Amino acid sequence: MNVPRGWLAALGSVLLVSAAQLGMRWGMSRLPLPEAWAGQTPEHAALLAVALAVAAYAASLLCWLAALRHLPLGRAYSLLSASYALVYLLAASLPAFEETFTTGKTLGVGLVVLGVLTVNARRTAAAPAHHPSRKAL
């Protein structure tokens, strides 16, 4: 286990999945409903945003797999929750999304962040490099 590499991979996953969420929201809000696709020409920038968001999801998955290789599942999984806070902050801050900060949402996101910090505050004992139950083939 290489914990710094795991943290870096988890951070990459959080950033990419957050970008994917924002890109998907921006693109889909500018495209017609699926039942109207036959009669309208979709906005190319919106289609590109959705395509890039799908690619960001795929890249996020690769980062997530790397994070799972180097971090305990409980720690890694809690880090994914940081994307909720990041998406909320960016969506409410950037005018393109027309989202607003509210007391309830901010309190909820604050609790999520507090949970992530709590789970990751304690250092855990280093895991063995290999599992004793695994036998060399």
UniProtKB/Swiss-Prot annotation:
GO molecular function, one term: carbohydrate derivative transmembrane transporter activity
Topological domain ranges for the Periplasmic compartment: 27-44, 98-100
Membrane topology: Multi-pass membrane protein
GO biological process entries: lipid A biosynthetic process; lipopolysaccharide biosynthetic process
Pathway: Bacterial outer membrane biogenesis; lipopolysaccharide biosynthesis
UniProt key word Cell inner membrane: yes
Domain of life of the native organism: Bacteria
Subcellular localization: Cell inner membrane
Assigned GO CC terms: plasma membrane
Membrane-crossing segments per the record: 6-26, 45-65, 77-97, 101-121
Segments in the Cytoplasmic topological domain: 1-5, 66-76, 122-137
Keyword Lipid metabolism: yes
Record's keyword terms, sorted: Cell inner membrane, Cell membrane, Lipid A biosynthesis, Lipid biosynthesis, Lipid metabolism, Lipopolysaccharide biosynthesis, Membrane, Transmembrane, Transmembrane helix, Transport
Cited Gene3D superfamilies: 1.10.3730.20
Function: Translocates 4-amino-4-deoxy-L-arabinose-phosphoundecaprenol (alpha-L-Ara4N-phosphoundecaprenol) from the cytoplasmic to the periplasmic side of the inner membrane.
Subunit composition and interactions: Heterodimer of ArnE and ArnF.
PANTHER family given in the database record: 4-AMINO-4-DEOXY-L-ARABINOSE-PHOSPHOUNDECAPRENOL FLIPPASE SUBUNIT ARNF-RELATED (PTHR30561:SF9), SMR FAMILY PROTON-DEPENDENT DRUG EFFLUX TRANSPORTER SUGE (PTHR30561)
Family, as annotated: Belongs to the ArnF family.
Protein name (Swiss-Prot/TrEMBL): Probable 4-amino-4-deoxy-L-arabinose-phosphoundecaprenol flippase subunit ArnF
